[in-house]
Design a protein with these regions (language model features):
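Hydrophobic packing positions in regular secondary-structure scaffolds
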Residues: 1-272
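Alpha-helical transmembrane segments and their membrane-interface boundaries
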Residues: 261-410, 414-428, 432-436, 445-456
Length: 456
């Protein structure tokens, strides 16, 4: 069994591979690929040119090795290495892939090539692949595997163990799923329970009847939550009639969690939700990030318009301009903190309809406490920093910071919840849209308070 290696060895392997590629020592490369774990090869390929990526893939010693490497590669790299592969070669590789992996890879190709590949894969696999491809993206149906072990509820323990031993896909067996005569899921048996039960007992006597399952349309994020909540190694997938269709395994769940977390982090940073952004070209990268920057630009123009509206006030009291960055900064930061906390709570299931209002009130209280503390500090400091003898200047600055931070926490906490109820991804609430809105509100409040107290 090949073992995974550490980062220092990865660096050494990468430099060795690059040197051998330059020397065109293809035989040596094949020998290294045979001995190296595919996950490590996939990691190395990220830093290679597209030509070298294809060369490494072509030098894999067997179709089985290529299949295992495809399982580890990023989606964008899979497209590149298979781009010029013939449908015949792809079908050979597919013999060693699960049907859900086959469906995912076929979905990357144009429709014409999809049909050509489907005609060349095995008949049994073809039906399963076409079924998986028919389900919506990011649903349980689209990520389930059909290679699983099921038995009728009237099967004895002795017969079950015998059939289990002869099952070809035994690396996918986490649980034994029990079906009735209509292929409906009626129970589940752990392998431990199976081997410790009497041979004469039937599965319906030892199975667990209270089953957690997903339907084909269940969002993959909900599947991941169920697996994490109940510590399952796999989750069964059924249709609306409770007919058993397949399972989502723990390795797929790990991938789902990683993908969803990456999407959330990217959206929270305001760079879209493309998980492969690091592997995109500069032009593609700029295109995905441009809309988010545009939101900040529009917000900045709005803030500039508000400042221009109060131009006469600034002409009279120019020192007010010095504290605009402070007002914007504290409001934006505390608002982002609140929205991040709520987004994380929604993702983990700790925030729901039952505790929505208490949570918003709690964040509002946090914003008020921080607003009082920082408002007092900056308000008193303003009198000394400016060196201007102006009554109520500190009051204006302190009150503006208090209002900005209080409102920012309320907005930051409530917007993700509202977006969730409207069916949008709440992660976008921590991006430029909300922070820009908080900046505009903060600037407007600052000048309204200043004009009210200092002029009137």
């Amino acid at each position: 069994m090949k073992k995974a290696i550490f980062s220092t060895e990865i660096s050494l392997l990468r430099s060795t591979m690059q040197r051998l590629l330059r020397r065109r020592a293809h035989t040596n490369i094949s020998k290294i690929l045979r001995k190296t774990h595919q996950a490590d090869v996939a990691l190395i390929m990220r830093s290679l040119s597209q030509y070298d990526q294809k060369k490494i893939f072509s030098l894999c010693p067997t179709s089985l090795h290529k299949a295992r490497l495809l399982e580890e590669l990023d989606d964008s790299l899979i497209e590149k290495v298979l781009e010029h592969e013939s449908e015949k070669n792809i079908s050979k590789i597919f013999r060693y892939l699960d049907t859900n992996d086959q469906a995912t890879i076929i979905g990357m190709f144009p429709d014409s090539k999809q049909q050509e590949i489907l005609t060349k894969i095995e008949v049994d696999d073809k039906d399963d692949v076409e079924e998986i491809m028919s389900y919506p993206d990011d649903s349980a149906g689209s990520v389930m595997t059909k290679e699983t072990f099921t038995l009728n509820q009237n099967t004895t323990v002795k017969e079950s163990i015998k059939k289990l031993q002869s099952f070809p896909e035994n690396d996918k067996i986490f649980y034994l799923y029990v079906l009735d005569n209509k292929e409906k899921l009626v129970g589940v048996v752990s392998l431990r329970t199976l081997v410790t039960s009497k041979n004469s007992k039937k599965l319906k006597e030892i199975m667990i009847k209270d089953i957690q399952a997903a339907t084909t349309s269940t969002d993959q994020e909900e599947v991941a939550k169920k697996v994490a909540q109940y510590n399952y190694l796999a989750l069964p997938v059924v249709n609306r009639q409770n007919k058993f269709l397949g399972i989502v395994t723990i390795d797929d769940v790990v991938d789902i969690i990683r993908e969803e977390a990456s999407e959330d982090f990217l959206q929270m940073a305001g760079v879209g939700k493309d998980r492969e952004i690091l592997l995109k070209s500069p032009i593609e990268n700029a295109q995905s990030r441009a809309p988010w920057i545009l939101a900040s630009l529009i917000g900045g123009i709005c803030a500039a318009g508000i400042i221009s509206y109060f131009n006469s006030l600034l002409e009279q009291i120019i020192v007010l301009a010095a504290f605009i960055p402070v007002i914007i900064g504290v409001g934006g930061n505390v608002g982002t903190q609140s929205s991040t906390i709520v987004v994380r709570g929604l993702a983990t299931g700790r925030v729901d309809a039952a505790n929505t209002f208490p949570l918003i009130f709690k964040e509002l209280l946090v914003g008020s406490i921080l607003g009082v503390a920082y408002g007092l500090v900056v308000g008193f400091a303003a009198e000394y920093i400016t060196g201007i003898d102006m009554s109520n200047l500190g009051l204006v600055i302190g009150l503006s910071i208090f209002c900005s931070m209080t409102i920012a926490t309320a907005v930051g906490a409530s917007v993700p919840i509202v977006l969730k109820k409207l069916g949008f991804d709440p992660a976008i609430s921590t991006g430029p849209f909300v922070t820009t809105a908080i900046d505009i509100i903060g600037v407007a409040l600052y000048f309204v308070i200043a004009s009210t107290i200092l002029i009137n």
